[in-house]
Every structure is written in C-alpha cells, then in structure tokens.
Amino acid sequence: MRNDPFQRLGLDREVLTVSQLNQRARLLLEDVFPQVWVEGELSNLARPASGHVYFTLKDSNAQIRCALFRQNALRVRQALRDGLAVKVRGKISLFEGRGDYQLIADTVEPAGDGALRLAFEALKEKLAGEGLFASERKRLLPAHPRRIGIVSSPSGAVIRDIISVFRRRAPQVELTLVPTAVQGREAVAQIVRALQLADRQGFDALILARGGGSLEDLWCFNEEAVARAVAACATPIVSAVGHETDVSISDFVADVRAPTPSAAAELLAPNAGDLQQRLDGLRRRLVLRMRDQLLRERLRLEGVARRLRHPGERLRQQAQRLDDLDMRLRRAFERQLAVRHERLVRLETRLAAQHPGRTLALLRQKLDSLAARLPRAAREVLKDRRQRLEGLAQTLNVVSPLATLGRGYSILLDERGRAIRDAGQTQPGQRLKARLAEGELEVRVEDNHRTPVTLSLLD
C-alpha cells in the first residue's frame, strides 16, 4: 500500500462528507495537473447565453467534459464545431456539486489537418483581398496550342497520363517537362524556380500537375510563394493538383483549374475528331451563307432588270401619283377657301356690330339723357352750396369780433394800432383809440390799475 495516496494523506482513518471528499479531490487534481495539453475531437458543443462554451473532448476510447469560460472563449480564433480536431490547454478539476471530473480550458487550437485548414483559409482570404483570384485577370487558354510546358515530377503516373492524352488527342503538340519536386522540404523552392523557368520558354500554355495525396502531401501547392509564382506567370496556366475533391491555393490563382492532370491535358489537347467536326460545320455554314448571298443578289438583279425592261410601268406609277397629288391639291384649296370664307363672314358680322352710325346713335341718346339730367343736378348742387354758405355765415357771425362789439364792448388800440389786452401796456396820459360797434373814440389814460378778474359761482 505504499502507493496509496489516501494513506499518504491520512484519509484511510477519516470519515468524510461527500462535499469534503469532492473538495479534496478537486484540490488534489488541480495540484497534480495545474496545466496540461490534451488532443481530441470536439462533440456535444454547447453555447449558453452566458458566453461560456461547454463541450466533450474525445478519442476512440475515452472522453472528458470541458468548460471554456467566456473570457477565454473570446480569444479562440478558430470557429468551434462538432467533429473538429483540436488541442486544448487547461487544468484538470472537479465540479464539486455533481462530482464531475472535467478540464477547465483556457486555450483551444486546431490539431493536425485543422491547423492546416486554418492556415489555408487565412492565405486564401489574404490573396483574395489582393485580387489574385479575380476573374478579370484570368486568361483564356489557346484553342490550338503548339508547345506546352509541364511543371511536375518526372516520375510517377501524372506525366505518363498527360503524355497519353496528348498522343491520343493531339500528337502534333510539342510537350516539354520542367521537372520539380512536388512534395517535401525542397518542393516549394523548386516549384517556384520551375515556374519562372517555364514562363521564359515561350510556351503557349503551362500545366502545373501533381497526383493525389493527403493534405500534408499537397501542402506545397498551398504555400504563398507558389501562389505568387503562379500569379506572376505571363503564360496561361492550368492547375491540376490532386484528385477532383482536392482544392489548393494554386487552383484559385491559376487561369483554369482542372480536377485531375488528365483533365488538364484534355483541356489543352484539341481532339482531331472535334477539329474535323468543327471544320465540317464551318464548311456547311460557309456554303449556306454563299447560297443566301447568291439568292439575294439574283433577286436584286431581277428587280433591276424588271425596272429596265418596263419603263412604261414607272411612267404609269408616276402619272397615278401625279393624279393623286392633283386631287389632294384641289381638296386642300377647297378647304382653304372654305376657311377663308368663314373667316370673312365672321369679320363682316363684327364690322356690322361696330358700325359708326350705330355708335353715334348710342352716343346721341346718352347725350340727350345727360342734357335732361343737367338742370336738375345743377339746382341740387346750388341748393346744397347755399345751405352750406348760410351755415358758415352763422358760424362766422358767432365768432366775429363785430358781434362782440355789438354787445357793448370796445377794442382799445395804441398809436401803432395794436390791441391793448393788459393795463400794464399803457402809461398815464397815453392816448388810445377805442373802436366801437359804430365809430371810434379818442381817449386818454388817466391812471392804470392791474386788478385781476375773479369769477364767483352763484349758489
């Protein structure tokens, strides 16, 4: 029992509650496995509203529950999904409430093909953003190539398949192999050099080919250096890497992607039978067009001949046209004459309505009426003016100083003819003139007294 951990901890003689047992088990696990990397496949992936991620990590024989809390889940760049192979870093712990053994993860990374797939998607997105996959930069393949360069391995079935297709379909095409490694550490550099060399040889087209394999085997065709070398080629290039289900970055950058190397050869190898059928079709189209052209020319010449042989028909047509124009001219003249006559009638009616004799009669009638109304109007005006004059005379008589003098008052004037209004304006012995209602008096001032005038109210 030397290796019994409970004996080392002295737990073989202590009775624990379930909570105590789970707590000590958790502490023991976290102490022994503070950080560990585990590789497996994701399953039972769950994302509750809290933002935490829960999943099961499994292999063919076992599984373990995992928890990835929100702050760590936000740092995971790879989209997690069931079936994804990953590497998980975390600590081994135990959920005390249920006694569940689990891995508390802080990092999740793709494993195996998953890492390669992530790199593949990243490079694909980068090159697409630069426009290397744009359709407008793709070039058409030559319809009848004479010289084709093949960038591939000199050994293996790929080059034999390509040669076989060209021998069968287009033996006249000259094929040149530009050898390169297509797998391994040196493959990327060799493929780049082979593409650059082939692009300088003046080939009509290039084939970049490799047989099938795993993702790791085909990875050199997913390297950025190879992709940029393909994009830099001035020669139209067909990418034929792997089987039909395999897709590489070079497929996206090349002008044309072929599912297999044999399919690439068929794209560039014009079939003799197809060429013969195309020539036959062109010959038939040419014959039909010549027949149509001859028929049109014959009809045109026959029409010209008919016009030349029968000038009388043309004269008859012109005479008929002249008669038609004459009739149209007569009808137009008659319509114009009717319009002018109608307009003349309207003018006569308006002129009769505005005849000077009628106007003079109306004016004379109006003048007689005014002459009859004038004496009566003059009497009314004269009467009104007389009444207004009498009213003004009465008003004037009321405010006239002569009326005041008529009531016994007088006006004193000094030697300059100025009216005396205040006793202070005179001096004793001064001579004044008193104007009465009837006549004037010469008076002399004996004395002057300035006595204020007071008014008293009668009770």
Swiss-Prot record:
It is found in: Cytoplasm. One of its GO terms (cellular component) is exodeoxyribonuclease VII complex. GO terms for molecular function: exodeoxyribonuclease VII activity; nucleic acid binding. Its EC number is 3.1.11.6. Keywords: Cytoplasm, Exonuclease, Hydrolase, Nuclease. GO terms for biological process: DNA catabolic process. It catalyses: Exonucleolytic cleavage in either 5'- to 3'- or 3'- to 5'-direction to yield nucleoside 5'-phosphates. Its main location: cytoplasm. Pfam families: Exonuc_VII_L (PF02601), tRNA_anti_2 (PF13742). It comes from the Bacteria. Heterooligomer composed of large and small subunits. Belongs to the XseA family. Bidirectionally degrades single-stranded DNA into large acid-insoluble oligonucleotides, which are then degraded further into small acid-soluble oligonucleotides. This is Exodeoxyribonuclease 7 large subunit. It comes from Pseudomonas aeruginosa (strain LESB58). The gene is xseA.
